[in-house]
């Protein structure tokens, strides 16, 4: 069976509560909108005997969806995440001659009490770049708005199956407690070398990055 999307989630035995909460939400969406033949979920759970890079590579190899997306077991996603994405993919022939390389959507980032929106753009760099007239004359974000930034599509966006063979490699990290902090970034640099030409954009907040409480995140 060829699914439209493959959702790839690495986890750990010690993270079963977070993982079960996430999976419950995904399967409720799949059941509600009858998407069992369109959405594939692949997970690898271990006791840290397999590196995070290796787990993500293994799941990419196993995936059969037209597009794949990497999520973490503590990620938050919208209540209509699966429905929105599947509906968008099914309508792609209406507004795209060829299948796009990437399907992107917005991320809400919660960091140390602050809030901002990250929008994907193929012409953006891997760093956050302010978009729109949000900066005051002093170079600060204007008060009363949620700032928006452009960034190259991150791993929570959907990548065409042709990128399945773009694999991760272990990277050196300057932070001993975060050994994988550059793995995702280096993978995206490899994706860039494949020269993605088209991105289809869904204007909704599909993913939430919650770093208000760093203790709730994990380094696998």
Regions found by a protein language model. Give the residues of each.
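Short, well-formed alpha-helical segments that are part of the catalytic scaffolds
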Residues: 9-30
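Glycine-rich, basic loop-to-helix element that forms the pyrophosphate-binding segment
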Residues: 47-63
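Short aromatic/hydrophobic "clamp" motif used to bind/position activated sugar donors
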Residues: 68
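Acidic donor-binding/catalytic loop of UDP-sugar-dependent glycosyltransferases
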Residues: 75-88
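A short, conserved acidic/glycine-rich loop-to-beta-strand motif
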Residues: 92-108
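Short beta-strand-to-loop element that shapes/binds the nucleotide-sugar donor at the catalytic cleft/hinge
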Residues: 103-121
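Active-site donor/metal-binding and catalytic loop motifs
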Residues: 110-116, 202-220
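Acidic donor-binding loop at a coil-to-helix junction in glycosyltransferase catalytic cores
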Residues: 180-187
């Amino acid at each position: 069976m060829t699914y439209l999307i493959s959702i790839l989630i690495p986890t750990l035995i010690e993270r079963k509560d977070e993982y079960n909460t996430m999976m419950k939400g995904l399967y409720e969406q799949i059941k509600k909108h009858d998407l069992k033949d369109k959405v594939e979920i692949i997970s690898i759970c271990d006791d840290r005997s397999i590196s995070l890079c290796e787990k993500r590579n293994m799941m990419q190899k196993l995936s059969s969806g037209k597009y794949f997306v990497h999520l973490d077991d503590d990620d938050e996603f919208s209540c209509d995440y699966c429905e929105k994405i599947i509906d968008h993919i099914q309508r792609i022939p209406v507004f795209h001659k060829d299948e796009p390389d990437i399907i992107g959507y917005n991320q809400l980032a919660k960091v140390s009490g602050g809030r901002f929106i990250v929008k994907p753009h193929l012409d953006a760099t891997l760093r956050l770049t302010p978009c729109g007239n949000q900066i005051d004359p002093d170079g600060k974000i204007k008060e009363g708005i949620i700032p928006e930034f452009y960034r190259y599509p991150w791993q929570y966006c959907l990548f065409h199956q042709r990128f399945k063979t773009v694999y991760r490699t272990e990277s050196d990290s300057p932070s001993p407690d975060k050994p994988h902090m550059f793995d995702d970034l280096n993978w995206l640099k490899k994706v860039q070398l494949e020269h993605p030409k088209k991105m289809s954009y869904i204007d909704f907040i599909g993913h939430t990055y919650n770093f208000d409480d760093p203790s709730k995140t994990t380094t696998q």
